[in-house]
């Protein structure tokens, strides 16, 4: 079984080596790892130097460079299209964050998860899930969004906004075949809605969500406003097409 790992990255040259250093102990060296990198030139160079050292050890790692900050959704979508064009026979594609919030343990667990699904979401809100290091206000906001968005979109999941996901080959093909309405983090909600409408199977598994290793969140006020507008756009179009 071949699994591709896609990691969107924005100036995370410090945290990504920590994440990959632990992950590659249990990652098949022949399975591709694609870094969708929107970092500035300094961060990009440091990242490339580290990734080259992993290539020298035999790991199959590639970088898909963005000239600007494309937003998470656009970066991952481009990496998916690259995977579909260059590694056509893969079984699954996993998306995970570069900042250390997604544990390598959970990535490996989802890779090896035996129950078949088209979209497998690592959820922060199942019985055995945990969130480490979040303030009460951040928990409340996340919990609210993950209640209201699935409710309005009629998707039975507990965590529609987390970016730790495993896609079947079919799901990756489908989400790359349409023109998305949004970018950034709200793209995750749009993507789940599209997969549901294609009558593909969505499942969740519990994960432990960790604090980012370095720095603070790269999500800006502009990103949040854009996400809210994107959600309204998805909801409006979803209702109009019913």
Language model features: what each stretch is:
Residues 30-41, 64-66:
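Short beta-strand/loop segment that forms part of the nucleotide-sugar
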Residues 1-3, 14, 18-21, 25, ...:
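Hydrophobic helical membrane-anchoring modules
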Residues 61, 66-83, 92, 102-183, ...:
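Acceptor/aglycone-binding surface of glycosyltransferases and processive sugar-polymer synthases
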Residues 37-47, 100:
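A conserved acidic beta->alpha catalytic loop
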Residues 10:
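A short, exposed helix-loop element centered on a Lys and neighboring polar residues
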Residues 50-58, 82-90:
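Alpha-helix termini
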Residues 2-3, 24-34, 59-61, 91:
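Short loop->beta transition adjacent to catalytic acidic/histidine clusters or analogous donor-positioning motifs
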């Amino acid at each position: 079984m071949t699994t591709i790992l896609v990691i969107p990255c924005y100036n995370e040259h410090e945290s990504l080596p920590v994440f990959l250093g632990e992950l590659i102990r249990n990652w098949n060296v022949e399975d591709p790892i694609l870094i969708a990198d929107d970092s500035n030139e300094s961060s990009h160079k440091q990242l490339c130097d580290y990734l080259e050292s992993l290539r020298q050890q035999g790991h199959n790692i590639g970088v898909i460079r963005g000239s600007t900050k494309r937003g998470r959704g656009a970066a991952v979508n481009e990496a998916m299209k690259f995977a579909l064009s260059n590694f056509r026979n893969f079984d699954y594609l996993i998306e995970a964050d570069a900042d250390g919030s997604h544990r390598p343990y959970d990535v490996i667990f989802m890779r090896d998860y035996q129950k078949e699904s088209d979209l497998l979401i690592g959820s922060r809100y199942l019985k055995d899930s945990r969130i480490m290091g979040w303030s009460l206000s951040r928990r409340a906001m996340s919990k609210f969004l993950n209640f209201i968005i699935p409710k309005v979109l009629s998707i039975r999941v507990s965590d529609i906004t987390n970016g730790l996901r495993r896609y079947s080959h079919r799901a990756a093909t489908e989400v790359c075949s349409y023109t998305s309405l949004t970018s950034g983090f709200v793209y995750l909600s749009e993507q789940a809605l599209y997969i549901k409408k294609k009558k593909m199977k969505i499942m969740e598994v519990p994960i432990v969500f960790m604090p980012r290793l370095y720095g603070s969140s790269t999500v800006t006020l502009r990103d949040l406003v854009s996400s809210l507008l994107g959600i309204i756009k998805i909801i409006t179009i979803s209702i109009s097409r019913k």
